[in-house]
Amino acid sequence: MASKIGSRRWMLQLIMQLGSVLLTRCPFWGCFSQLMLYAERAEARRKPDIPVPYLYFDMGAAVLCASFMSFGVKRRWFALGAALQLAISTYTAYIGGYVHYGDWLKVRMYSRTVAIIGGFLVLASGAGELYRRKPRSRSLQSTGQVFLGIYLICVAYSLQHSKEDRLAYLNHLPGGELMVQLFFVLYGVLALAFLSGYYVTLAAQILAVLLPPVMLLIDGNVSYWHNTRRVEFWNQMKLLGESVGIFGAAVILATDG
C-alpha cells in the first residue's frame, strides 16, 4: 500500500515538473517567434508591435526572467517579474497601434496573454515547487486562477461570436455543432470554477485533458489560420506556444492545486 502511494506521489511530482518546464520555457518561444515575425514584417517594410529600441529591452527582460525561472533561482520573484513584463509589453503594443488586428484575433491574442500572466502568478505563489521552503501565497494563486478563468470566458465567447473560431471547431473536430456547444459549456463551467475558487484542482485536471486535442487540431492547424484566416505564420506559432504554456499552468494546478 505504501509503495503504491509512493509511486503515485512520484508520478504526480513528475507531471508537475513537466508543467513547470512548459510554462517557464514559454517566454523563450515567445521571443523567438516574435523575432521571426518581425523579421518577416521588416522584409515587407512593416513595423513591429513595439518600437525597436524598447523591443530589445522587452525581450531581454523576458529572457532574463525565463532563464532564472528555468534554473529555479528565485523562481517566485522572477515569475512575478515575467508576469509584469508580459503585462507591460502587451499594454505597450496595444496603445502603440502600429499593427491593426481584427477583433476576433485580438481576443485570441490577448486572452492567451492574460492566461500566461495568470500562469506566472500561480508559479509566483509557490505552486509547482518540489521542495517548498516558504508557505504558498494563496492571494497570488487566486489571482492567477482568476486570470485563467477570464481566458476561458474569452474562449467560450469566441465560440459563440467569432465566425473564425466556430469554423475552426466545426471543420476540425468531429461532432459538428453539438461538439461546439459541448466545448462552450465546458469552457463556461471551468471558467466559473477558476473564478470562484471552488473545485480548482478538478477543473484544472479537466482543462489539462481538454487542451492537448484542442492544441493539436485547432491551434496546430496552421494552414487553416495562415492560409484561410490570414493570420501571420509566426504569430500563429506564438499563439500555439502560449497554448502549450497554458497547458503547463493547468498541469501545475491539477497536480499541486
Curated annotation (Swiss-Prot):
InterPro entries assigned to the protein according to its UniProt record, in alphabetical order: TMEM101 (IPR029371)
Presence of keyword Transmembrane helix: yes
Keywords: Membrane, Transmembrane, Transmembrane helix
Residue stretches spanning the membrane: 24-40, 52-72, 77-97, 110-130, 139-159, 182-202, 206-226, 233-253
Major location category of this protein: membrane
PANTHER family xref list: TRANSMEMBRANE PROTEIN 101
Membrane topology designation: Multi-pass membrane protein
Superkingdom to which the source organism belongs: Eukaryota
Entry-linked Pfam families: TMEM101
Organism per entry: Mus musculus (Mouse)
UniProt lineage: Eukaryota, Metazoa, Chordata, Craniata, Vertebrata
Name the UniProt record assigns to this protein: Transmembrane protein 101
SS bonds (residue pairs): none
One cellular-component annotation, GO: membrane
Compartment(s): Membrane
Gene designation per UniProt: Tmem101
Role summary: May activate NF-kappa-B signaling pathways.
